[in-house]
Amino acid sequence: MFLLGILEFAAIILQMFASDFKVIYVAAAFFLEIYYVFMMEVEGRYDQMTGVYSKRFYYSEIEHLPQNGTYLVFMSDANGLKHINDKMGHEYGDLAIKSVGRSTWDILHSKAKVFRIGGDEFVGFSKSLEEKDMPKYIDAINARLSEDSKKLGFDVTASVGYAIHTPGEDFQATLHRADESMYIAKNEYYERTGIKRRE
């Protein structure tokens, strides 16, 4: 809306100082092109389903992560998504994905960048999150999901894993450790609930 206001203001200025309509039309086309590029950039940065950062933006951002930096990497996804899809339908599965994405974003986005990289998989990284604090953030995410579950009429939970990137470590290696941590949490969920892994 801010950029649209600038365009309107520019159009008024052009009408005041440019008597040649061709100049006005060319300038208007130029400003509209800028607006189009800006909107494409905004849309490309965010995942359309969940509102978190997109997979495209994720690949752009990891290119700028320092190889020698120290930061926390986390992964999360919905528990029992196949069970939800099979028993209730894919539209409910989509609601679960949205809920996990939004809950993760709401709890962590002030401290971390959160991306949806596919399906129900979310990845994030942060220089300010500390490993010792992650359990309370994970509890907060699932508390938010519990609130959503009451509104949606079915249970939505998430498993979250995390790892610390150490200087000199390859990012993919850190991501793999976070993924392994997530699957430990996921196995604990299935053991606790009695739901079979692929249900």
Predicted regions and their residues:
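A structural signal for short, well-ordered beta-strand segments
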Residues: V73, F122, A158-Y162
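Conserved long alpha-helical elements within nucleotide-processing catalytic cores of c-di-GMP signaling
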Residues: S54-L72, N79-H109, F115-G119, V123-G124, ...
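Interfacial "cap-and-anchor" motif at the non-cytosolic start of specific transmembrane alpha-helices
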Residues: M1-G44
